[in-house]
Amino acid sequence: MGMEGLLQNSTNFVLTGLITHPAFPGLLFAIVFSIFVVAITANLVMILLIHMDSRLHTPMYFLLSQLSIMDTIYICITVPKMLQDLLSKDKTISFLGCAVQIFLYLTLIGGEFFLLGLMAYDRYVAVCNPLRYPLLMNRRVCLFMVVGSWVGGSLDGFMLTPVTMSFPFCRSREINHFFCEIPAVLKLSCTDTSLYETLMYACCVLMLLIPLSVISVSYTHILLTVHRMNSAEGRRKAFATCSSHIMVVSVFYGAAFYTNVLPHSYHTPEKDKVVSAFYTILTPMLNPLIYSLRNKDVAAALRKVLGRCGSSQSIRVATVIRKG
């Protein structure tokens, strides 16, 4: 379908929300808004800490800062509109707004898939080839990894968004979701989308399996290397280096596995919305918290910054007292 078809489709959609008719919309708004603020704050703090503390100017933390940037944009794609809909009776989203939401969502989730895979490779090099780490993970390689993650993630967006929005939507304009997720949008189409859904399923599984293969191979080599270590301290450091990444991967890929791998018989609109809420709202909050709570370097950098702020405040108070 060409431009004429797109123009015929260019009318507003209606989002039903996370809960279609919430009994306490104010309470739901407060919960989601609190999570949103914590997620944005935690990710921005992580980015600033990595930028400010010279001890964190390493490839691992550079990649972690990029993950925080992705998480910050990721949660801003869906949550502000969701919060607006909780307070407003007008829950519409424009055709263009829906298309933009789909494109950014696919780009960010795909980008995170690839970035988490490349972060596993970084851990593999650090544990298995520590002497060659500066060479194998130099600045050019890190930049290539980040650009590759964004480009790889955007492939899904560029391929799937135009096709999805080209279908004729002649049924209800009501999307049973809190944002424009492709399966929910396709249910409004009055044409057979089964072939496209099969191809989309294969595309998403491929996007999932490529980085998952990198993660699996990397951690297999890490486990073999750790097993051969004689030093208990060396083993502890190796596991400490990888534990935060493993937790983040488990959370993110667990939700993605449900969405992209399980057959349609397991899916219901209610389940889909809960899982989507988990990895679009909760995951961006959990990622920086997991890394900050389980990582001594990040915790030390945070204490250092807080200590500076406390010292500066004490000096200001003392100066004011002297002047008084």
UniProtKB/Swiss-Prot annotation:
Report any one BP term from Gene Ontology.
Answer: detection of chemical stimulus involved in sensory perception of smell
Q: This protein is called what?
A: Olfactory receptor 2T2
Q: Show which residues sit on the Cytoplasmic side of the membrane.
A: 51-58, 122-140, 221-237, 294-324
Give TM regions: 27-50, 59-80, 102-121, 141-159, 197-220, 238-260, 274-293
Going by the UniProt annotation, this protein carries glycans at: N9
What SUPFAM superfamilies does the record point to?
Answer: Family A G protein-coupled receptor-like (SSF81321)
Q: Give the family this protein belongs to, as stated in its UniProt record.
A: Belongs to the G-protein coupled receptor 1 family.
Q: PANTHER family attached here?
A: OLFACTORY RECEPTOR
A single GO cellular-component term on record: plasma membrane
> What does the UniProt entry say about where the protein is found?
Cell membrane
Primary localization:
membrane
